[in-house]
Amino acid sequence: VRAIGDPVARFSEDRLRILRAIRFSARFSFPIEPGTWEAILRFATAIGDVSQERIREELDRILTGPHPAEGWNLLKRSGILAVVLPEAERMEGVEQNPEFHPEGDVWTHTLKALSLLEEEPVVSTLEGDPSQASSLLAWAVALHDVGKPPTAAIREDGRRTFYCHEQAGARMAVVILTRLRFPVHFIEDVSDLIADHMRLAAIFQMKDSTLKRLVGKTLRSWPDSGPMSRYYVNTLLRLHRIDCLASYGGLAEYDHARARIDALVPGAEKPPRLITGRDLLGMKVPRGPVYTELLKAVEDAQLNDELSTRTGALAFASAWLRERNLDFTELVDGDDA
């Protein structure tokens, strides 16, 4: 890959060309001509003069095109990443526990994860433009551990911890993607995926209600209808699988999660409510923490297949209140719905 004519002159005309040079190098696995590379290094800090929208488009094309890990690494080596995504650049040198991450530090793990993107085909049931789905997964992969550097700590026994790094990373992703002028719904979707990316690690202990709530989540940037209704959890599964393969390599949790999700009948994650807030108001339960907690308790029991009728739900609600010594008028059992 070489600039036409004088690379300094070409990059002076439009600094975005340094990102395009890196994208072409990654896409075709071509080396960058030494003179062009020197000019890229010279203009790296000037990339900040380019509008965030144009930078976003090039970064997105790097992540969704062939060999995204090569492109991401070139951004790091050139110094461009430190300008446009300093939060990601800080992953380098953040060591991890080798039993879970034999591949190395957080940066190395992220590059390995990005290299696996090409092995993750777009979900076959996806309707619409597949590039949008690719972008969601790609940005979630690129930023899924961005919260590790600020949460890194070492215990007295020498083990490294990154407590709540997924929540920290989700918040950071909002800042990063907002800065890059991504659409609001896209930002929310990527942030949610990052916040949830560790949840399937507990799939063997996960209650049915918790799993069904996860399955019931939707992508705000896509219509929630037909075969799209489980697109969020399908994307989360792909992120989880990539994360595992880029670290210790085990897929036991992924396989179990996939099997449990596939076994759910359509609509199991969002069954009709057995009772509503109106029923609780009839008990004189005021709107507030108790009201909200009781509705959730009934819904959890329903999702765990412990309740299936309105009569049972009313009895459950009455017992729940009695156990807590709450002095409300009890509901009168109604007919089964």
Residue ranges of predicted features:
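Short amphipathic alpha-helical segments and their helix-coil junctions
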Residues: 1-7, 111-121, 211-223, 275-281
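Terminal helices and disordered tails flanking the catalytic cores of nucleotide-processing hydrolases
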Residues: 204, 244-337
